Design a protein with these regions (language model features):
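OB-fold (S1/OB) nucleic-acid-binding surfaces
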Residues: 186-214
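Generic detection of short hydrophobic beta-strand segments and adjacent strand-loop junctions
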Residues: 111, 214-216
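OB/S1-fold single-stranded nucleic-acid-binding modules
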Residues: 2-183, 239-265
């Protein structure tokens, strides 16, 4: 499945975790540290189990689906906002039709959705207010838009979702993932420290085909400067900005205008 299952590996190869300062060798180590932190909150009830979220003051998040198919996947408390029609592919992966305020489609992308397990059995959710964070896997920086255009031959407003292409092709030969390729301009950049681990990471606000947050491992490098271009590959995460109040059943899922379909959870 698209969610990152708890893995038992002996080496630090979880680049996506390191990009938000969760510098653990194993997913299980991250889960155990999150549980011990006393910063867990129940997002909602799912098929007799729970969807639990750990949120670090740095914005780093860990979502834990404590019922079959049991998944652990990262997220981030992003500052950028947008709108999308949201349709779940499985318990974790969502197909997003990212739209502008007039309803015009900007892009289609697949992302690991923080509330995904709550919506897995629900129909298409239209006009959802969402936040998007790209977790950098392999990126490079260009001094300016002109430098990017000179090197790549195109304007730096790229966002291509491999998972969305797989879904639109209708081919069952490939499994969609939240992987994406992007190029965008840096609007803001700052260093943050994950309190759970003490590890630093870079948090950027990006202006590209649509606005999104970008998190990168610190790596001892200088922060990308404002108006520089960052491009490369990433894992896309998303969160629905749900209205307060919820459904009154502890599900933690808002049912306001266009709500997120809390029935049956």
């Amino acid at each position: 499945m698209a969610g990152m299952n708890v893995k038992d590996t002996g080496v630090k190869q979880n680049t996506e975790m390191q990009a938000i300062g969760l510098n653990f060798e194993r997913w299980q180590d991250a889960v155990e540290a999150a549980i011990a932190s006393d910063r867990l909150a129940v997002t909602g009830e799912v098929r007799g189990g729970q969807l639990i979220q750990f949120t670090d003051p740095s914005g780093a998040q860990l979502n834990i689906l404590a019922v079959e198919p049991f998944a652990t996947f990262i997220g981030f408390n992003a500052v950028t906002q947008g709108f999308a029609h949201v349709e779940m592919v499985n318990d974790v992966l969502a197909l997003l039709e990212i739209i502008d305020p007039f309803g015009t489609t900007i892009a289609q992308a697949t992302a690991n959705l923080a509330q995904g397990p709550l919506l897995a059995d629900e129909p298409l959710q239209q006009w959802q207010q969402i936040s998007l964070t790209a977790v950098g896997l392999d990126v490079r920086t260009y001094e300016s838009a002109a430098a990017y255009e000179a090197a790549e031959g195109e304007f730096p407003a790229l966002f291509e979702s491999a998972g969305a292409k797989v879904i639109s092709s209708g081919s069952g030969a490939e499994v969609p993932t939240p992987a994406a390729t992007f190029a965008a301009r840096v609007m803001e950049s700052e260093s943050r420290t994950n309190e759970l681990t003490g590890e630093k990471f870079a948090h950027l606000v990006m202006d590209g085909l649509f606005p999104f947050d970008l998190c990168l491992p610190a790596g001892g490098n200088e922060l990308p400067a404002k108006d520089s271009i960052v491009a490369g590959t990433a894992l896309l995460t998303a969160s629905i900005e749900m209205p307060s109040g919820g459904c009154g059943d502890g599900a933690g899922c808002g049912c306001g205008s266009g709500g997120c379909g809390c029935g049956g959870h």
